[in-house]
UniProtKB/Swiss-Prot annotation:
Region (Interaction with the C-terminus of SPBC25): 132-197
Protein name: Kinetochore protein Spc24
Subunit and partners: Component of the NDC80 complex, which consists of NDC80/HEC1, CDCA1, SPBC24 and SPBC25. The NDC80 complex is formed by two subcomplexes composed of NDC80/HEC1-CDCA1 and SPBC24-SPBC25. Each subcomplex is formed by parallel interactions through the coiled-coil domains of individual subunits. Formation of a tetrameric complex is mediated by interactions between the C-terminal regions of both subunits of the NDC80/HEC1-CDCA1 subcomplex and the N-terminal regions of both subunits of the SPBC24-SPBC25 complex.
Gene name for this UniProt entry: SPC24
Family to which the UniProt record says this protein belongs: Belongs to the SPC24 family.
Function of the protein: Acts as a component of the essential kinetochore-associated NDC80 complex, which is required for chromosome segregation and spindle checkpoint activity. Required for kinetochore integrity and the organization of stable microtubule binding sites in the outer plate of the kinetochore. The NDC80 complex synergistically enhances the affinity of the SKA1 complex for microtubules and may allow the NDC80 complex to track depolymerizing microtubules.
Region (Interaction with the NDC80-CDCA1 subcomplex): 1-69
Any one GO biological process: chromosome segregation
Source organism, top-level taxon: Eukaryota
Organism listed in the record: Bos taurus
Coiled coil: 21-131
Keyword presence, Nucleus: yes
Predominant place of localization: nucleus
């Protein structure tokens, strides 16, 4: 812009110098046109500078909007990742709760089976105490009166122990069922029973 002003000053100087000359009128016309072109050029330059400032301002605004949009997109991405992580945690917790529920359901079924088994056993015990045990006690007492043998029910497995209360003396019984036959044991015990009533 300074260069154009210098050119204008030079043009003015030339006009004054050429004024004495015959071609002065022609030169003035040429210089006038030159001045008009320089003025148009300066106006165009001013307009271009104004447009350039407007373009720069617009570019800054667009750049700021773009940065804002990127920031919002980034924040949105962070929120999406957070939501995905929360969803993953919730899914894992849901799976854990379902597994616990399944385990508790199995345990409940097992407890129901145990309860049913206990009820069945209770009925059997009731039946034993009302029917089987009294009759077994009666039979055991009857055998004791007949055989006069007092059994040792706390002896080791495979051993037969007790005391036979014979007519004159009490005699201990000590038999090993793993080494003696059932027939021998039966015959031995029946031989202890007194045939006289």
């Amino acid at each position: 812009m300074a260069a154009f002003r210098d050119m204008e000053e030079v043009s003015q100087g030339l006009l004054s110098l050429l004024g004495a000359n015959r071609a002065e009128a022609q030169q003035r016309r040429l210089l006038g046109r030159h001045e008009q072109k320089v003025e148009r050029l300066l106006e165009t330059q001013d307009g271009a500078e104004k447009w350039l400032r407007e373009i720069l301002t617009t570019e800054k605004e667009v750049a700021q909007r773009l940065l804002d949009a990127k920031e919002q997109a980034h924040q949105g991405g962070v929120e999406v990742r957070q939501l995905e992580a929360e969803l993953q945690r919730a899914s894992e917790e849901d799976a854990h709760l379902k597994a616990n529920l399944l385990q508790l359901t199995r345990e409940l079924e097992e407890l129901k089976e145990i309860e049913a088994d206990l009820e069945r056993q209770e009925k059997e015990v009731d039946e034993d105490t009302t029917v089987t045990i009294p009759s077994a006690v009666y039979v055991a007492q009857l055998y004791r009166r007949i055989s006069k043998i007092e059994w040792d029910y706390e002896c080791e497995p495979g051993m037969i122990k007790g005391i036979h209360h014979g007519p004159s003396v009490a005699q201990p019984i000590h038999l090993d069922s793993t080494q003696l036959s059932k027939k021998f044991i039966s015959d031995y015990l029946w031989n202890l029973v007194d045939t006289e009533w």
